[in-house]
Amino acid sequence: MSENNNDKTTGKKTLTLKRSVLETSTVKQNFSHGRTKAVVVETKRRKITRPDEKAEPLQPITKPHVAPQRSKPRFEEKKPQEAMAKSNLSSAEMEARLRALEEAHIQEKITREQAEKEARLAKEREEILKQEIQEQEILQKQEEEKPTVPISSVSSDPSLIEKTDIPIVPKNTTVIEKRKIDENQEEERHSRRANPAKSEIRAPKIVKGADERRRGKLTLNSALDEEGSARGRSMAAMRRRQEKFKRAQNQEPREKISREVVLPETITIQELAQRMTERSVDVIKFLMKQGQMMKPGDVIDADVAELIAVEFGHTVKRVLESDVEEGIFNITDNPQNMQPRPPVVTIMGHVDHGKTSLLDAIRKANVVSGEAGGITQHIGAYQVEQNGQKITFIDTPGHAAFTAMRARGARVTDIAVLVVAADDSVMPQTIESINHAKAAGVPIIVAINKIDKPAANAQKVRTELLQHEVFVETMGGETLDVEVSAKTGQNLDKLLEAILLQAEMLDLKADPQRTAEGVVIEAKLDRGRGSVATVLVQKGTLHPSDIIVAGNEWGRVRALIDDHGRHVKEAVPSTPIEILGMQGTPQAGDRFAVVTHEAKAREISEYRQRLARDKAVARQTGSRGSLEQMMTKLQTTGVKEFSLIIKGDVQGSIEAIASALEKLGNDEVRARVVHSGAGGITESDISLAEASNSAVIGFNVRANKQARDFAKTQGIEIRYYNIIYDLVDDIKAAMSGLLSPEQRETFLGNAEILEVFNITKIGKVAGCRVTEGKIERGAGVRLIRDNIVIHEGKLKTLKRFKDEVNEVQSGQECGIAFENYEDMRAGDIIETFRIEHINRTL
């Protein structure tokens, strides 16, 4: 007896009373993901008994003295062991061993039942598979017994018959594939089974003359069968059927469609092919035939593109890049919607004649105190109301540097108010303002200001205006004139009445129901709000969320702010308004218009930016030329450039500064604005100044902390200004420092060489007598022989007798030696002179 509790089913068991008559076999199960399991199946052979015999009853396991006859020798061997165990083991140990034997028998019984169950399930699966195969064979036979249409074309035209035997594929491919899921499993199962009973699945027989049309294959034997059986469709018929199906599916080459191709001035090959709906490869092949090797990304001009499009059978419509701007400003007004609009009045005149003060008195505000130096350096737009009627005022600077601003103000105005100081009369900027107003074709109203001063002489002003073809009413003309005082407010109401009277005569009307259109008065870059443009709406009504194009920039209107800082919902004609939401800062004087969608606005903006860039490049190329030309020009002319980076608060001021600096240069030095823009000074401006060796100028703006630190590190000075006079004066002084000083030569005297001495360690020394003026030590000298200057240099030694002296007067003798020159002869004349350097100014 063994104490090992081994519950595995094997051929030999140690804890049995008799050898079990079992037949073993192994069943291998396959699961998903490649897992397998082997199960041992034991089949007990039944004992055959006769009817008159009784089965031998099973003896209880716990009685060792009862033993089966077949195991008698084995039992007899165990007898002394059990007797010995009885004598040596206690009752508790004996019970434990008997209990272990019982558990082993129970485990063996469970294992045997599981194996029988697995074998039964495997047999059932095999029977189900056989049944399915039989059903498939029956269905296949029924299908093949159906009548088929005979094929006459095959017998009539044997040349169309395929001459190679084509194997026939059975229809029960799904069943065969099901059988072949795991071929190794079936082979192993049948090889290990004790009573192998393989059920070979034979391919179903194909009935002669069956419908082979479904297979699409035909053999020579079946086509030439003489028994008159039904024949399938020929291969030629199958091909014709496939070609017909392809034609039905439009798989043949499509018919060429002629299109109208829009061609700009330049276009890439890829884009041209897309517009023609052709392949770019075909276009490139056509160009290769013409002898041009090009790529899809290459740019061709409109002429070549037109030839290609015509060759491919398309019509061409040529357009210009400027066509994107068509229809923006050419919108016609509806006469039925025309309504009266407020007049736009521009205040013009000489500097310090009281233009802004007059406007302040009308607006009852104080703008002058906010302007640096008491002078207007920005163009401002305001709106006032008089007797229920609105008047839009545009204030322009009077300084000479703001000529462009005055011209811009005159172009957008309806009436020009010419302010002339009664104590100062007509001045240069007054004349310029008159010319601007006449060029713009707007009527003029003369406002004679400062009439309250004792030195005021209004009649003198009227008389001087006659010289410039401005005829006031008191002098028999048609121009209105009003004597006013901005300080006391005298006759301001008369001035406003004159403006309204002139506007009534002009009959100003506009259509508020159309899209907005106008002009940019001023533009700046605000730190918190971004690009801010002050515009004057001339036509239509401007609303928030409108998409506008102003010059080279575009944007969507985020907010509309009036001259009092209030947000408004719309801006009607003749209204000055601030716009927020521009993508960039437009230039003052640019026209703006509302467009329908964002794509068009972006296209117009990109076209204008490209045009401005090309003009700038052409201007630089024309002024610079090639490198050799530039170097030759620098060597011959010696022009020096004073590079500047200008940052200002608004575009108009930057424009005025650049215009003033252009007038400062001469043939030797000139100012060059490397970069200019509205907004504060940033670190990138300092980097650009370092790279271009430029000076940084801030006009009414400041540098941020990063820019200041970087400028301090790089040693770049930043100059701040708020008055344009001071800026221009400082730049003028700095540019004057670049001018080469003027050299002025002063004649000192002449000396005649009497004899030349050769002295050791010194060289040749000329013994001379001063014949005119004096000879000074360190002066410049010229050696003249036969009235020809043969040497010019400096005086090295001047001695009288044996002593070094600073100067020798006329009539005295002295010894003279030259620096690095010794070719002196008796009779030569030595001329001495002094050169003075005098600084020049612009």
UniProtKB/Swiss-Prot annotation:
Keywords carried by this UniProt record: Cytoplasm, GTP-binding, Initiation factor, Nucleotide-binding, Protein biosynthesis
Family: Belongs to the TRAFAC class translation factor GTPase superfamily. Classic translation factor GTPase family. IF-2 subfamily.
Gene3D superfamilies in the record: P-loop containing nucleotide triphosphate hydrolases, Translation factors, Translation initiation factor IF- 2, domain 3
Biological role: One of the essential components for the initiation of protein synthesis. Protects formylmethionyl-tRNA from spontaneous hydrolysis and promotes its binding to the 30S ribosomal subunits. Also involved in the hydrolysis of GTP during the formation of the 70S ribosomal complex.
Spans annotated as G1: 349-356
Protein name: Translation initiation factor IF-2
Major location (coarse): cytoplasm
Lineage, highest ranks first: Bacteria, Pseudomonadati, Pseudomonadota, Alphaproteobacteria, Hyphomicrobiales
Family annotation (InterPro entries): EF-G-like_DII, EFTu-like_2, IF2_assoc_dom_bac, IF2_II, IF2_N, P-loop_NTPase, Small_GTP-bd, T_Tr_GTP-bd_dom
Stored PANTHER family: TR-TYPE G DOMAIN-CONTAINING PROTEIN, TRANSLATION INITIATION FACTOR IF-2-RELATED
Region entry G2, spans: 374-378
Segments of this protein annotated with the region G3: 395-398
Protein's gene: infB
Location of this chain's protein in the cell: Cytoplasm
Classification via HAMAP family: IF_2_B
Annotated spans, G4: 449-452
Amino-acid positions noted as binding GTP in the UniProt annotation, renumbered to this chain: 349-356, 395-399, 449-452
